[in-house]
Amino acid sequence: DDDVLVIAHRGAAGGAPENTLASVALALEHGADVVEIDVQETADGEVVVIHDSDLMKVGGNPMRVWEATFDEIRAVDVGSWFGPEFTGQRVPTLEEVLETCRGKAVVDIELKYYGHDEMLEQRVSDIVERTGMGDQVIAMSLKGDAVVKMKGIRPEWDVGLLTAKAVGDLTTAEADFLAVHVGMANSAFIHRAHEAGKDVYVWTVNDRLNMSRMMSRGVDGVITDHPSLARLVLEERAEMSPVERLLVTAAFWIGLEPKEPPADLDLEG
């Protein structure tokens, strides 16, 4: 059987506004094993959950996260852009997301850097310590030195490197797991990573055939905007014979569904 984690990308971002408590709650409702979120520091040192460097996409506001106080950021509605039913959603704190997921799912904390971070790794560590959820978090970053720094502060955590392109041999990177664009995750790469003791998570996978193809290749986790679909694919595969699974992979190659999108950092990031 497949031993694959369903990792909800920015919460269940296909069904609710990304990185909000609504998307986190939906991810839990849809059976995510792991809830992935992005964190940054505000001007006054709060660790908040938001992907972009400003609030234009989610709030129609050019306010930059590192220049604004937590209260200023909290005043912005970051739900109505997605749908009127989400009006009133606010940028949550890391602590709020951790409390929402307590005892229900692992939280994958992606450390975001836009050149203005001060103590992000230490502050994240302190918040997790304060909530007593050290055994329920993992962390990752696009920056290799941030991975090393976070691992230095929290050697007991699984800390991973996130990447959209192969630079050298990633399997030798100082990281516990590799979160790679789906286009990089060929069978040879996955095998080398596993030989090096590293799990492989792929992002961002939002269609059935790609999900099934990645599961057949032996990835350890699928990062998706649609955790309910990933859970359904896992359930369907559990009922399939090996031949039926091969037919699903064949369907991908003859073009029954679109192949993976080009590697674009904003797909994850």
Which residues does each PLM region occupy?
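Phosphate-group recognition and catalysis centered on beta-loop-alpha active-site segments
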Residues: D1-G269
